[in-house]
């Protein structure tokens, strides 16, 4: 039983005035404690909740991949635009200037080079290939058709560089290229016109058409070894 006496301390939210009990009442909140008739309790409500912590950034794996790609792609794009662009343009300008200068020089070379005619093509020294005699001096392969020389093959030797080829191969080559297929030595039209066609028979002798002089293949081989001009072209 409670009496009619009440006690209050201040006012405000969360403050509850409890009437003073008339008798001793045991409490269950605090074991071993009793409430007497002169006790007064003020019950304070729960404190206000703490503010919620800031939410962390929730990144899914797909969003994380996009973020990484953006961090890598943006610097690469900036580098390509501001650093690589001027270098590539300067390289293009230099290459175009070199191309224009080479194109300016090319017409002079084309004009100065005389056309290759049938007369100049067939005016080199030629003859039949003999393996035992010519394999060491002129080789065993035609550099135009890449075929191996065989005995009795009709060969033609350039007087400037002493390289030998099949007659048909070198004639076809010289119609389009004014140089040797191996060493790129320019074939002089004047020297070709002056050098007569020298047939070589199987026995190794060189016969001059229009003359009685015979030059042996042995002396010709000696000229090759010593670096002297071909003996057949001295007449």
Curated annotation (Swiss-Prot):
Residues passing through the membrane, by range: 64-84
Span list, region Disordered: 87-133, 201-235
An example Gene Ontology CC term for this record: membrane
InterPro entries: ATL1/ATL16-like, Znf_RING, Znf_RING/FYVE/PHD
Reactions mediated catalytically: S-ubiquitinyl-[E2 ubiquitin-conjugating enzyme]-L-cysteine + [acceptor protein]-L-lysine = [E2 ubiquitin-conjugating enzyme]-L-cysteine + N(6)-ubiquitinyl-[acceptor protein]-L-lysine
Zinc finger residue ranges, RING-type: 142-184
Pathway involvement of the protein, from the record: Protein modification; protein ubiquitination
Domain of life: Eukaryota
Any one GO MF annotation of this record: transferase activity
Protein family: Belongs to the RING-type zinc finger family. ATL subfamily.
Free-text note regarding domains: The RING-type zinc finger domain mediates binding to an E2 ubiquitin-conjugating enzyme.
UniProt-recorded name of the protein: RING-H2 finger protein ATL33
Organism annotation: Arabidopsis thaliana
């Amino acid at each position: 039983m409670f009496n009619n006496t009440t006690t209050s301390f201040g006012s405000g939210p969360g403050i509850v005035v409890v009437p003073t009990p008339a008798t001793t009442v045991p409490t269950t909140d605090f074991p071993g404690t009793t409430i007497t008739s002169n006790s007064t309790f003020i019950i304070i409500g729960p404190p206000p909740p703490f503010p919620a912590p800031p939410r962390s950034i929730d990144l899914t794996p797909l969003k994380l991949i996009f973020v990484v790609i953006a961090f890598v792609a943006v610097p690469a794009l900036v580098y390509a635009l501001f650093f690589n662009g001027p270098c590539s343009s300067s390289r293009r300008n230099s290459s175009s200037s070199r191309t224009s200068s080479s194109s300016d020089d090319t017409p002079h070379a084309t004009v100065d080079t005389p056309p290759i005619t049938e007369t100049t093509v067939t005016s080199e020294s030629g003859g039949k290939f003999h393996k035992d005699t010519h394999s060491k001096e002129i080789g065993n392969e035609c550099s135009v058709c890449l075929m191996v020389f065989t005995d009795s093959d009709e060969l033609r030797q350039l007087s400037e560089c002493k390289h030998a080829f099949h007659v048909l191969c070198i004639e076809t080559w010289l119609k389009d290229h004014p140089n040797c297929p191996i060493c790129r030595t320019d074939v002089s039209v004047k020297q070709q016109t002056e050098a007569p066609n020298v047939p070589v028979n199987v026995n190794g002798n060189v016969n001059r058409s229009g003359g009685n002089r015979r030059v042996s293949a042995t002396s010709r081989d000696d000229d090759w070894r010593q670096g002297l001009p071909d003996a057949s072209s001295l007449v």
